[in-house]
A protein has these predicted regions:
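HIT superfamily nucleotide-processing domains
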Residues: 4, 13-14, 18-143
């Protein structure tokens, strides 16, 4: 798997590495120079921001499927749900906490849907974990 580093001499983990939930050792980059969402985080391309703090960015989807449609992302580059580690839990928890507050502020007062597409089968288009928040005044239809 790309990004995994081997054990150092004596079987210990190498300096500067992170052990994930499964005991794997990874070196995760803060941002990916080719990732469109990382470019939005860095301010290299515009995004219609909804919210921003040191860990999380929320911005409107450029192809909305409902009157309220925005995405929440961790600022740290994590390609997909498969790549999340325990170290990512605070940012992901913040994302889930913000989803309802921001949805309500943007007009989804009677409910909304959260969607996380993961991998090829899940039709993930951008390889940076993101949560879509979709809502509006009318029911969204069945899943």
């Amino acid at each position: 798997m790309a990004g995994l580093r081997g054990r150092g001499a004596g079987g210990g983990f190498r300096h500067g590495a992170v052990r994930d939930l499964y005991g794997d050792e990874r070196q995760m980059a803060a941002t990916d120079p080719n990732c469109i969402f990382c470019k939005i985080v860095r301010g290299e391309i515009p995004g219609r921001k909804v919210y921003e703090d040191e860990d999380v960015l929320a911005f409107h989807d450029i192809q909305p499927v409902a009157p309220v449609h925005f995405m929440l992302i961790p600022k740290k580059h994590v390609a997909s749900m498969y790549d999340l580690t325990a170290a990512d839990a605070p940012a992901m928890g913040k994302i889930m906490t913000l989803a309802g507050r921001l949805a309500r502020e943007l007009g989804a007062v009677d409910g909304f849907r959260t969607i996380v597409n993961t991998g090829r089968v899940g039709l993930q288009e951008v390889q940076h974990v993101h949560v879509h928040v979709v809502g509006g005044p009318d029911p969204l239809g069945p899943m």
